[in-house]
Amino acid sequence: MLFRSGLDVQYIHIKPRIIAEKFIENDGGDLYDYKIFCFNGEPKIILHIEERYTDKEERMFFLDTDWNQLPFNINVPLELDADLPRPANLEKMLDIARTLSQGYTAVRVDLYSLNDGSIKFGEMTFTTESGISRWHPESANEYMGSLIHLPGVDD
């Protein structure tokens, strides 16, 4: 595997494999993607993506864990939506992310929320967008960095 286009160096010594996953259907509806950014085992930021698997243009929104929209985005212009519905199972998704992220300084836990209320696991990653995404505005980089606390360094 070559790492010329991204910064996913944590995979460099892992033998490449092909993994086939079961297709996730959502009763004919959009598949809502929730990427939960966790720092030291605590969810802090949610990236909600919709229209990702449809013919419409993908939309993404960053939110805090109280479902307040944050004023930044990655790779696409900022879009504010005052009427973004809070998922009924948000607390359950945050609990899952909290459990899975224990022991990691910074990790993103990806989950899917289905129309029947079930939650499906997507992945965990240490390098969002392979570590090369462009945050808008630039101050979002500082905000994300401020959430990382390294024992022995921050003390």
Can you say where each PLM-predicted feature lies in the sequence?
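Short, surface-exposed beta-strand-loop junctions and turns on beta-sheet-rich folds
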Residues: 51-54, 127-129
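Beta-strand scaffold of nucleotide-dependent catalytic cores
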Residues: 33-49, 60-61, 120-125
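Contiguous hydrophobic, core-forming segments of folded domains
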Residues: 16, 24-27, 31-35, 43
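A short, polar/proline- and glycine-enriched secondary-structure boundary/capping micro-motif
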Residues: 55-62, 131-135
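A long amphipathic alpha-helix within ATP-dependent nucleotide-binding catalytic cores
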Residues: 8-19, 60-119
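C-terminal active-site "lid" helix and adjoining low-complexity regulatory extension at the edge
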Residues: 113, 118-155
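Short, flexible loop/turn elements at secondary-structure junctions
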Residues: 22-24, 38-40, 113, 125-128
